[in-house]
Amino acid sequence: LHLAELSLICLTLYAVTSLVVGTRLIARSWRSRGLPEFLIGCTYAVASGTGYPLSVVAPYLSGRSATLAAMIVAQVLIVLGCSAFAFFNAKVFRPNSSWSVPVAALGSLVFAGSGLGVIAAFLSAPEGALAAESARSATAVFLFALVACQTWTALEGLRHYRMMKRRLALGLADAVVTNRFLLWGISGAISVTWNGVVISALLAGANVSASPVPVLAVSLGGLASAVCLVLTFMPPVW
């Protein structure tokens, strides 16, 4: 099994898992009228489950027009999903803090601006050129903002896990809910790690689609994230 094939399998698994989990969460939000479920559902269904795989497939489409159209749609979906993620952090973990919503809004602006930069790079790249190389700077900025959001969610998940663990010892919390905060924190840390590796590769001038280290990091990170998603939102019945 070649590294490229392993990467494709892992990322496909992550995308499918994200789409299924995200769709279920959005459906649940329609029934419960819950904003958090809707926001995180959009994150997974729109960005991870649809936008990201579309951006991977786009360069292989037949014809420049089809490729550009797919890349534009993919970037819009990714920006929307990642912005929803930022506001999920604000609304769920810091609902009463005066700074959380402005920080989420700032993150969304960075996502939108860098997303536009990626689109502009693809539109201006000459035919036959590696447009991804032209979008290197904008992609790095986008990933920096994403890693910041993922660091935020990882720290909040682990902070709430510690709080719930103390309450669990007093019989005031549920063990399953407590464990899910731990899984959420671990999932965030995994995402920070694999995106951090990609950022380092981008800044070093490496081809992140072909270099073994970022490809392996993305593959294993995607696989681990898929497992955490299932255990957090669709745990098996033992």
Residue ranges and their predicted role:
Residues 2-22, 33-121, 136-147, 210-224:
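Individual alpha-helical transmembrane segments in multi-pass integral membrane proteins
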Residues 123-133:
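Interfacial non-cytosolic loop connecting adjacent transmembrane helices
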Residues 121-125, 170-175, 234-238:
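General structural signal for secondary-structure boundaries
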Residues 24-52, 100-109, 139-201:
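Alpha-helical transmembrane segments of multi-pass integral membrane proteins
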Residues 29-33, 62, 93-97, 126, ...:
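Membrane-interfacial segments
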Residues 153-157, 180-238:
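C-terminal transmembrane-bundle signature of multipass membrane proteins
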